[in-house]
């Protein structure tokens, strides 16, 4: 038996999600930086693809092409993360034409990516110590 989801349920969920997203700014840059100390695969590729200026559609296309479809970023996830990256100072909005906005990685965003690469390389070294004997 399928359960029906009411508009009220969706509205309540939307309000909870919106309040959590808006709290990002209220917690300040320190909390945002802590949140991004370890990146998810989607976060990593979104930032990587913003090395060059691009809008949301550009980013989704670049991630798909770069990973051969292995990593998918949906619009909801993408725009949520873009807002968080903007608030944390990892990307900057470069253009706005109607509803279409373009973004680019900042120096702080490049540092975040480099730190993530170093973290991943350390994991590979640890793996090799144990399994490549």
Question: What are these model-predicted stretches?
Answer:
Residues 1-34:
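Short, intrinsically disordered or compositionally biased N-terminal tails of bacterial proteins
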Residues 33-77:
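N-terminal helix-turn-helix DNA-binding core of bacterial DNA-binding proteins
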Residues 20, 114-133:
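Amphipathic alpha-helical dimerization/coiled-coil segments
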Residues 98-117:
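Basic, amphipathic "hinge/linker" alpha-helix immediately C-terminal to the N-terminal HTH DNA-binding motif
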Residues 79-84:
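Short, hydrophobic-biased segments on the C-terminal half of alpha helices
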């Amino acid at each position: 038996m399928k359960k029906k989801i009411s508009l009220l349920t969706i509205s309540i969920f939307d309000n909870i999600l919106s309040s959590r997203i808006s709290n990002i700014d209220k917690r300040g840059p320190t909390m945002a930086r802590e949140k991004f100390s370890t990146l998810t695969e989607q976060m990593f590729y979104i930032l990587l693809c913003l090395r060059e200026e691009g809008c949301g559609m550009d980013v989704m296309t670049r991630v798909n092409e770069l990973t051969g479809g292995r990593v998918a970023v949906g619009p909801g996830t993408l725009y949520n993360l873009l807002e968080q990256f903007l608030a944390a100072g990892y990307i900057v909005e470069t253009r706005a034409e109607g509803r279409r906005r373009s973004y680019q990685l900042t120096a702080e965003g490049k540092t975040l990516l480099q730190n993530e690469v170093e973290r991943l390389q350390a994991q590979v070294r640890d793996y090799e110590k144990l399994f490549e004997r």
